[in-house]
A protein has these predicted regions:
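Beta-rich, blade/repeat-based domains predominating
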Residues: 1-15, 39-58, 75, 86-108, ...
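Short, solvent-exposed loop/turn segments at conserved positions within beta-propeller repeat blades
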Residues: 13-20, 64-74, 113-115, 166-167, ...
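A short loop-to-beta-strand structural motif that recurs across blades of beta-propeller domains
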Residues: 20-23, 74-77, 117-119, 170-172, ...
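Hydrophobic alpha-helical segments and helix pairs
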Residues: 22-82
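Beta-propeller fold detector
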Residues: 33-37, 87-91, 130-142, 182-185, ...
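Loop/turn-rich, solvent-exposed surfaces of beta-rich toroidal or solenoidal domains
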Residues: 116-117, 121-125, 135-179
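Short loop/turn segments immediately following beta-strands, especially the blade-tip
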Residues: 120-131, 217-224
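Blade-level signature of beta-propeller repeat domains, shared across WD40, Kelch, NHL, RCC1
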Residues: 191-229
Length: 229
């Protein structure tokens, strides 16, 4: 990263980058186990976000990697519970980032950073997406007309997609039908949101440009994660 006008801004892939992977960490012992490093011989570039379903199946995004003059694209992947095999849900998106499941687990949502789009995969079964169009298994739920980047996301109990939004500095809430609204925060680099509290209306939001983690009340309850602490 580098500093600009008091903000911390991430940069390109460093020369000593050793590759992307999914790790399992034992919180009691600190032991680290590498779970996945590739898909069919193709190395993971930068696994970014992940979510589990009720059966313990894992969905995760690979953001890809940026360099000064080019970019490695990323994808969306699946690992069945108890398996070490990585399956590809979809590939060749620009920059898949935040990922979440609808309350009924019938749809996987992910945010593509550079295009500022929320995509959806409607599932035939865990890890298998229906064909949305002749050209893609995914469908675009919403895309933004102005310059902004989408980062991590959380799903509300009502099924809305709450996406941390860079440059516009806030949380963009996208409904399943594509309608969207924006809640602003005083930092252009809002990068993550998570829900908690007894009623799941406490929102924890990262303001990465100024290095802050804030807590605020949210107008709707968040969807409780399967392995919620």
């Amino acid at each position: 990263y580098h500093e600009r006008d008091g903000l911390l801004i991430p940069g390109h892939c460093p020369p000593d980058y050793s590759g992307g992977r999914i790790e399992r960490i034992d919180l009691e012992t600190g032991e680290v186990e590498v779970v996945a490093t590739e898909f069919e011989g193709r190395p993971l570039k930068g696994p970014n976000d992940l979510v589990f379903d009720k059966a313990g199946n894992l969905y995760f995004t690979d953001l890809g990697k940026s360099y000064p003059t080019h970019r490695d694209t990323g994808g969306v992947y699946f690992m069945a519970a108890g398996s070490d095999k990585v399956q590809e849900l979809d590939y060749n998106h620009i920059s898949p980032n935040g990922i979440g499941l609808s309350p009924d687990e019938a749809t996987v949502y992910f945010a593509d950073t550079m295009s500022a789009r929320v995509w959806a995969f409607d599932l035939e079964k865990p890890g298998v997406a229906k064909q949305a169009t002749p050209f893609s298994t995914g469908r675009v739920v919403a895309g933004m007309p102005d310059l902004r980047y989408f980062d991590s996301l959380a799903i509300s109990a009502a099924g809305n997609v709450c996406v941390a939004t860079i440059l516009q500095g806030g949380i963009t809430t996208v409904q399943p039908d594509g309608q969207h609204s924006h809640t602003a925060f005083p930092d252009p680099f809002v990068t993550n949101i998570a829900f908690g509290g007894e009623d799941m209306k406490d929102a924890y939001i990262t303001l990465s440009g100024t290095g802050q983690l804030i807590k605020c009340r949210w107008p709707e309850a968040g969807l409780k994660l399967i392995f919620n602490a």
